[in-house]
Regions:
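Conserved, mostly hydrophobic/aromatic
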Residues: 13, 92, 123, 165, ...
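Hydrophobic faces of well-ordered beta-strands that scaffold small-molecule active sites
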Residues: 1-3, 21-23, 57-61, 88-90, ...
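N-terminal basic/disordered segments at the start of proteins
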Residues: 1-20
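Active-site-adjacent beta->alpha loops and helix N-cap segments on the catalytic face
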Residues: 35-43, 93-99, 136-149, 253-255
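Conserved small/polar residues in nucleotide/adenosyl-binding loops
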Residues: 293-300
Length: 300
């Protein structure tokens, strides 16, 4: 699943081989500060472009919602259904229950920080897809997927719950959906899509008593690594992950095209039994320009 923050990046995602695309509308998504957010009237064209290539179109409506916004949410859900949007990605129960009530497929957002089987069981009454928290290890992901299969946990469609994970992109300093750093510093909430990403900045560590500056190897002390799983993609797919999500709705179309094409090629290689360390290293070289800090794989 590839990101689209503009029509340019939407085209890039589809050119890169994405079989699904996620996007936001206006201020009701986790990229509300973006300058090139789509508008509600763009929905029919977004869906048409995706469906022309056989890709699914997923609307992110994953911020926390206040009472005065519920009518706007309902109107947007109605417009999404009319336009043929394939699913809504959400974390607020007000959005989830309304979308479900009007027959829109629901996918649980990473903002719901789903980390365990109890959460999966609960959300299965509303959602067919669950995006697991970024912070889970590969072993934890595997146990949840095995649990879904063993217990036969099904969503509203009647099919087994599908598990989606973020495969590439930024890692938050906090557990997904639980960071308040931007709100505390700038009164701009990450959970309202308005994160200033102060954790992604360079910092100096100073001893307040002596004034001495501490020597550190990485000045990005609160965000030392980005998420990059291409070198362990065979293990991830072998664990039973159904959807690989690529972060980047605020990135350039070139970024989207490169990352999408690399992961598409790598996933195909896994399915065809052609994945190898040598090919993984080659994919990593192509991704180097798409890593802001340092890369890390999965902690097993």
């Amino acid at each position: 699943m590839a990101p689209a923050g503009s029509f340019e990046s939407l085209a890039a995602a589809l050119q890169g081989g994405a079989d699904s695309v996620y996007f936001g509308i206006g201020k009701l998504n986790m990229r509300s500060r973006a300058t090139a957010n789509f508008a509600e009237e763009d929905l029919p064209e977004i869906v048409a472009r995706c469906h022309e290539t056989g890709a699914k179109a997923y609307l992110t409506l994953n911020i926390i919602v206040y009472d005065e916004e519920l009518e706007t949410v309902r109107n947007l859900c109605a417009a999404a259904k009319a336009a043929g949007v394939d699913a809504v990605i959400a974390s607020d129960l007000a959005v989830i229950t309304h979308a479900h009530s009007i027959g829109l497929e629901v996918h649980m957002s990473v903002q719901a920080n789903v980390c365990n089987m109890a959460s999966v069981r609960f959300y299965a009454q509303y959602a067919d897809v669950v995006v697991l928290a970024r912070e889970l290890t590969l072993g934890q992901i595997r146990r949840i997927i095995d649990g879904i299969r063993d217990e036969g946990i099904r969503g509203p469609s009647g099919d087994l719950i599908r598990v989606e994970i973020f495969a590439h992109g930024a890692l938050c300093v906090a557990v997904s959906g639980k960071c308040h750093m931007s709100l505390a510093a700038y009164n701009s909430s990450a959970n309202r899509g308005a994160c200033f990403q102060n954790c992604r900045r360079a910092y100096r560590v100073t001893d307040e008593e002596t004034g001495n500056e501490l020597v550190i190897d990485n000045k990005y002390v609160m965000s030392p690594r980005d998420l990059c799983t291409v070198q362990v993609l065979d293990q991830i797919l072998d664990a039973g992950v159904s959807v690989l999500k690529l972060e980047g709705r605020g990135r350039s179309s070139d970024y989207v095209r490169t990352v999408t094409s690399v992961y598409r090629e790598a996933a195909r290689a896994c399915l065809e039994g052609a994945f190898s360390p040598a090919r993984a290293n080659a994919w990593m070289e192509r991704l180097e320009s798409c890593l802001l800090y340092t890369s890390d794989a999965a902690d097993e």
